[in-house]
Amino acid sequence: NQFSWETPFYLLSGLGALCFFAACFLPDFKGHIVEKNLQPKPVALLRSMWDDKNQRLALTMGLFLILGHFSTIPFITPFMTRNIGFSQEQITYIYLLGGGFTVFTSPLFGRLTDRFSALKVFQVLILISFAVTLLLTSLETASIALALTLNTLFFVFVSGRMIPAQTLMTSAVGPSGRGSFMSIKSSMQQLAAAIASLVGGLIIVELPSGELENYGWVGVFAVLISGVTLFIAPKLKVAPGN
């Protein structure tokens, strides 16, 4: 609130430059790379991914997770300001608390994923995230403290479920094809984020008073779409070489 709207973009650019500089000092990981003349063509690579049921399921799982994730996120700020009564200054605390707690909970979820199976941790976290999502999006009147608590829990569990999910999805492809797989997965997730935002915008209605209506239905949509992954995750298998 103390700087212009361009400040976050300058910050991201600066952090990106630092990451690029740091990447120059990372060791090379080339053991899995085949000779250049043996590498498949892009079209053949896409076809092999599609023909591999395991990779196809992993890509579908990532798609549905992001569809559910991003249908609600773009509307948190306007919903909190217009419906709950947050000031612009108080909006800062949503992301401060949500991001702050995630810094501590993400490593915890990572350790749980390593200690127990990724599937079990994913199933528990996604079910908790469903409850939090429905509670948050169905708020009508709430104190600032309650709304901040639900927002923080939303950030913790919605982002936390991605940790075991990533483990499940990346293990579905062998080391030699993982880079290509991750590129396709990232592209599909960007597309899913755009579609989810569009769908959320079509469901939500702005009342003459300025309040947003039907955000609760967006929450239901998010839960139903994300719920598909509960049926996909158990079918994923660890690819040879992992």
Model-derived segments and their meaning:
Residues 105-117, 204:
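Helix-to-loop junctions at the C-terminal end of transmembrane segments
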Residues 22-24, 209, 218-242:
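Multi-pass alpha-helical transporter architecture, strongest
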Residues 119-165:
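C-terminal transmembrane helical hairpin of 12-TM major facilitator-type secondary transporters
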Residues 28-61:
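Juxtamembrane intracellular "pre-TM" segments in multi-pass secondary transporters
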Residues 175-208:
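A late C-terminal transmembrane helix in Major Facilitator Superfamily
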